[in-house]
From Swiss-Prot:
It comes from the Eukaryota. Residues 1-20, 57-205, 881-981 are annotated as: Disordered. Essential for the formation and stability of microtubules (MTs). Required for the organization of the mitotic spindle and for the proper attachment of kinetochores to MTs. Promotes the recruitment of NUDC to the mitotic spindle for mitotic progression. This is Echinoderm microtubule-associated protein-like 4. It is linked to A chromosomal aberration involving EML4 has been identified in a subset of patients with non-small-cell lung carcinoma. This aberration leads to the production of a fusion protein between the N-terminus of EML4 and the C-terminus of ALK. It is unclear whether the fusion protein is caused by a simple inversion within 2p (inv(2)(p21p23)) or whether the chromosome translocation involving 2p is more complex. The modification Phosphothreonine is found at residues 96, 201, 237, 490, 609, 897, 899. The gene is EML4.
Amino acid sequence: MDGFAGSLDDSISAASTSDVQDRLSALESRVQQQEDEITVLKAALADVLRRLAISEDHVASVKKSVSSKGQPSPRAVIPMSCITNGSGANRKPSHTSAVSIAGKETLSSAAKSGTEKKKEKPQGQREKKEESHSNDQSPQIRASPSPQPSSQPLQIHRQTPESKNATPTKSIKRPSPAEKSHNSWENSDDSRNKLSKIPSTPKLIPKVTKTADKHKDVIINQEGEYIKMFMRGRPITMFIPSDVDNYDDIRTELPPEKLKLEWAYGYRGKDCRANVYLLPTGKIVYFIASVVVLFNYEERTQRHYLGHTDCVKCLAIHPDKIRIATGQIAGVDKDGRPLQPHVRVWDSVTLSTLQIIGLGTFERGVGCLDFSKADSGVHLCIIDDSNEHMLTVWDWQKKAKGAEIKTTNEVVLAVEFHPTDANTIITCGKSHIFFWTWSGNSLTRKQGIFGKYEKPKFVQCLAFLGNGDVLTGDSGGVMLIWSKTTVEPTPGKGPKGVYQISKQIKAHDGSVFTLCQMRNGMLLTGGGKDRKIILWDHDLNPEREIEVPDQYGTIRAVAEGKADQFLVGTSRNFILRGTFNDGFQIEVQGHTDELWGLATHPFKDLLLTCAQDRQVCLWNSMEHRLEWTRLVDEPGHCADFHPSGTVVAIGTHSGRWFVLDAETRDLVSIHTDGNEQLSVMRYSIDGTFLAVGSHDNFIYLYVVSENGRKYSRYGRCTGHSSYITHLDWSPDNKYIMSNSGDYEILYWDIPNGCKLIRNRSDCKDIDWTTYTCVLGFQVFGVWPEGSDGTDINALVRSHNRKVIAVADDFCKVHLFQYPCSKAKAPSHKYSAHSSHVTNVSFTHNDSHLISTGGKDMSIIQWKLVEKLSLPQNETVADTTLTKAPVSSTESVIQSNTPTPPPSQPLNETAEEESRISSSPTLLENSLEQTVEPSEDHSEEESEEGSGDLGEPLYEEPCNEISKEQAKATLLEDQQDPSPSS
């Protein structure tokens, strides 16, 4: 059994259908009651926390007034903001220093090990050590359980284990990125139920804690030697470099550089179906993450529709073959607010959004959809992913819902309008096929009766024959023809106008997974288990067949191509183009499991990725092609190229690491350090050392010789209290800076036996060769307010030291100015991923940025472009008419997009066209979605050269923001303005 069949569990047994329905109704009632009770409990808990905070505020003010009598006021050089009384339900006294914070685990295997919990020290001890280590000269600003006088009432809310009145709290484990990412990639009903509209109680407590903590400003000590930031109530000390005369004079602005999406590597075929089509323009349309890709395989160009806010799960083509409807799942933004599932109808030529349908209507996600054919695509039918799999019919141009009805509690795999009968809709799925009659605002159902034919476990797909009959393919490998009766079979004993089985055809070994009706009336079928594509004539006799090679996986989608070609989407995320005579050619491919490892070549346009699927892939970033791939013995997690570019080191989950030849992909060397996940591999600038950061809290050092082909153990850095997350080398190979899952910033003296440098201020002026550590004076401004320390997965500084790219847990890629040494720094923010962004890396010449998605398995290539300073509404068109590499000084158009009112549930952002005509007037469509202050960023058609002849390109710069607006990082929604007519 393939696909959905493998992930569904039919465990309900009952004497009759009515009995089953009664039991389900009772269970649903109980679940609803429990949800109501939980909601009440959450509200009560929030009220208790609010009252407790108010009480402590009162006690603090009393103590402050008593302690201030007869005492001089403290020095005012230590700024500290107070917690306001606004939004009291979200306030909570910060007890985080009494909470044991488990290490952030980046992968599910690490989450199961429990190693971080075993090796952690109690947080109170860690704080005590941190304070004694860095605050000897300024004890007055040390975090203390006692109230602080004057302008520092916030300190009252912080309690440490030393406090006599402190009450120990339960250990709260910090969530891993995998836990915080959207669970949209799991197929079971249980996993879908994880997406709740109301945050669970365990999530409520840290969220309220974060609300209190985020008001803590960065503290600078009296002498101006170091500053402190707070993470979950814990102080993190960073020493100020000597070349900073006055910290207050530092200004952090938006970088002039911006990103535009150039290429999306990968395809989502693993858990989707019928999602590959060829448009009349010659482009293949498919999706990966939240991006819908229009790929011209002959010219090797891509265009991208970027309107979606989360995973795209299905698509349908309008009868005019120009307009497209795509449906997405529900998501959650960084503040825990739900992002509603919806359908977007858009123009594949202009990339402009025509309509947004179903906000607030669909639950969990959109499972399948289809345009009507008999009335030229006026209507759209949609099945959502709720328990009831609601069927809705829409006049999509008017955004009007015509009818709505529950279909079944079983999974629904397909929905289609009848091509000639505008009032007939067919749905199929697990153990059923339903024929719906749509009349005005009502839908009536007639169930397909299998009668003497064996009832399949799944009706997988359906199509229509030229005479109006319905053709279905099922999990038994059988095709059934359903014909509509015009007269009663037996007068008075049977209904007329119903569909009955008229013929059965054995088509495949295993399931019939997809059906494709061709323009000439012939039929293509795709098998699951046998991986065969069969061509059937007009009488449904098999004519030709071809088998998809096993390495590509099973068939998920089949579509007609040009001439005698056809397109195939597979379960291993390949899109193949083939013919029965010549076989298959790979057009699109990607990883098939969670992706973390990324490295860019030191002087070539190459990038390497490794993932849990055990694939190591080398990609050409200029030609957008795969150079080679190799299957290694274990899942890969991190990688780094030797400075010579001849070899690359791959770290795995088990502590083993491999060295591969970058040209031949041959195995050069293999080593093992510990038995836990390796999180970072980093060569020194001259390639003579390799540092290996592990989840066993150690950094292993190797001497490297023979251009990266020989390794000998040099030493081990011991001192971190949690697993290693990031590390960087100094230019002279003498020092290493490292971060851990416990928010530590440690420095190591390599020549003197890899010793920990106790006086960290000695390292404040080191000019690090690379900057990938997420904690440090030069980069701490990238952290959002109220962060729990797990929100940023990766950071990288450009080689020219102008910008920092950041990968976060909320599907966003950020671009900051470097250095970024002020809290709440503004950034450009970009959306394309639909899972936590796991890694970022600049190419060798800083022309591009590469980002990787975790569970969405995508690789996104962004082009860095300079923003031109233009007066508002003034446009400059690129007059380049020949195909040439896109310059970083491409013409841009500047426009300010008003921030939508926060009361709107979903910000309907206009999808901006990648190209404009000679009269570039922007069309702004509002999205109904709550977002942060947004910057519009137009996506040009991504290709190896510039646009088609005569089509000027443009870029829309972001809005400049004030210091007040910079409190929340700017949201840079990729949007495509439609061209003016």
